[in-house]
């Protein structure tokens, strides 16, 4: 990755216009309501704990919604609660995207362990410039099964730490010295001319894009030692919003 540059990524520029927020419509428990009358904030987060999905939309149509719903059901089950049916969710999402339109958007669905759920649809702009990565030095447990859950502040704190250090994303390592993922992304790395991604068992969230590149692009699943990061030939950050963002450098 040497010499590939270190252009920063601005991320997804969510519309933060206050006048828009005051009249913003969201879904709360299947009903279209004003944001001020809902249980979520303007980014779709609710108080308490639960699971969530962040989904890319194109022309107001959510991408890979069924896959996201299956993951949400699985995540909720691991935490001991259930969520609304896919039929109910699809109907509510269609209504929301018809009212809060965006050529490209971010759909966030939050499912609380108390039975409440919410959805917001926000416009965003994707920045595909190559990202500079750093290795986060505080390891995570390799024993705990990752679940896409909130509060999400611990992951966002890692991302903010990376940005405050002059990087765009942080690589998380487990307590066995294995590479896991980015703070808010999965990793796709090229080593010895082969594309690989770390296994779920190493402490990796089961990303939708990660699953797709494994299924359709011949990507291998293999544990990666942190020392191997020095030998990476090429890399991408994977997420449902970024799709596949190229990496400019690692600890450069």
Question: What are the language-model segments listed below?
Answer:
Residues 102-107, 160:
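Hydrophobic alpha-helical interaction segments
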Residues 20-99, 112-251:
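Helix-start/capping segments and mature chain N-termini
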Residues 8-23:
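Short, Lys/Arg-enriched N-terminal segments with co-localized hydrophobic residues
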């Amino acid at each position: 990755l040497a010499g590939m540059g270190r252009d920063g990524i601005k991320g997804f520029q969510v519309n933060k216009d206050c006048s828009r927020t005051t009249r913003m419509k969201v879904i709360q428990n299947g009903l279209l309501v004003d944001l001020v009358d809902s249980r979520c904030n303007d980014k779709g987060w609710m108080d308490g704990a639960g699971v969530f999905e962040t989904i890319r939309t194109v022309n107001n149509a959510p991408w890979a919604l069924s896959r996201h719903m299956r993951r949400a059901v699985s995540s909720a089950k691991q935490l001991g609660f259930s969520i609304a049916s896919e039929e109910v969710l699809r109907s509510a999402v269609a209504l929301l995207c018809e009212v809060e339109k965006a050529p490209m958007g971010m759909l966030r669905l939050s499912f609380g362990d108390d039975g409440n759920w919410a959805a917001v649809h926000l416009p965003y702009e994707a920045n595909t410039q190559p990202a500079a990565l750093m290795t986060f030095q505080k390891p995570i447990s390799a024993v705990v099964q990752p679940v896409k859950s909130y509060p999400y502040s611990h992951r966002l704190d890692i991302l903010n730490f990376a940005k405050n250090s002059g990087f765009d994303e942080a690589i998380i390592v487990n307590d066995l010295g294995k590479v896991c993922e980015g703070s808010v992304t999965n990793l796709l790395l090229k080593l010895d001319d082969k594309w690989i991604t770390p296994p779920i068992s190493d402490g990796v969230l089961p990303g939708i894009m990660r699953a797709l590149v494994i299924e359709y692009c011949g990507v291998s699943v293999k544990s990666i030692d942190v020392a191997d990061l020095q030998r990476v030939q090429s890399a991408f950050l994977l997420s449902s919003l970024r799709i596949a963002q190229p990496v400019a450098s690692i600890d450069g």
